[in-house]
């Protein structure tokens, strides 16, 4: 149990630092759509889709790796709270179209990335 807790801790810390770095680097690129947050959410969705496809196929892999990558890293990398706050800020500024676009891109994009990664890695593992 301690090993699993440490895996979540290390993965979560690493994912959080990665999200912060993406936000610092890419959020200033667009005034209405926080590109860093979007990138973190889409990348996390892709990684978790890939991870679930991989771990479903490779049942012999230590469960510690699954929680390190999915619960830890992806949990730290992706962020619903920051995304929600950024949408609220856009709404407060009266930028309703940008707020709606941000919601649609994050939600639909995340679903699409998870499905794409799961499909790609399931197909690759089947070969």
Swiss-Prot record:
TM region(s), chain numbering: 4-24, 35-55, 71-91, 103-123
NCBIfam families hit by this protein: crcB (TIGR00494), PRK14196.1 (NF010792)
UniProt xrefs under HAMAP family: FluC (MF_00454)
Localisation per UniProt entry: Cell inner membrane
Residues given in the record as Na(+) binding sites: 75, 78
Reactions listed under catalytic activity: fluoride(in) = fluoride(out)
Listed name of the protein: Fluoride-specific ion channel FluC
Membrane topology: Multi-pass membrane protein
Functional summary from the UniProt entry: Fluoride-specific ion channel. Important for reducing fluoride concentration in the cell, thus reducing its toxicity.
Keywords linked to the UniProt accession: Cell inner membrane, Cell membrane, Ion channel, Ion transport, Membrane, Metal-binding, Sodium, Transmembrane, Transmembrane helix, Transport
InterPro entries: FluC (IPR003691)
Entry annotated with the keyword RNA-binding: no
Species classification: Bacteria, Pseudomonadati, Pseudomonadota, Gammaproteobacteria, Enterobacterales
Any one GO molecular-function label of the UniProt entry: fluoride transmembrane transporter activity
GO cellular component: plasma membrane
One of the protein's GO biological processes: fluoride transmembrane transport
Predominant location category: membrane
């Amino acid at each position: 149990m301690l090993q699993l807790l440490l895996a979540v801790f290390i993965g979560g810390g690493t994912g959080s630092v990665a999200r912060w770095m993406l936000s610092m680097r890419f959020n200033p690129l667009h005034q209405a759509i926080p590109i860093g947050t979007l990138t973190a959410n889409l990348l996390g969705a892709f990684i978790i889709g890939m991870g679930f496809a991989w771990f479903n196929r490779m049942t012999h892999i230590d469960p510690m790796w699954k929680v390190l990558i999915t619960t830890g890293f992806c949990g730290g990398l992706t962020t619903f709270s920051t995304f929600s706050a950024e949408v609220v800020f856009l709404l407060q500024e009266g930028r309703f179209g940008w707020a709606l676009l941000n919601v649609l891109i994050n939600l639909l994009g995340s679903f699409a990335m998870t499905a794409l990664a799961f499909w790609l890695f399931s197909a690759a593992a089947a070969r």
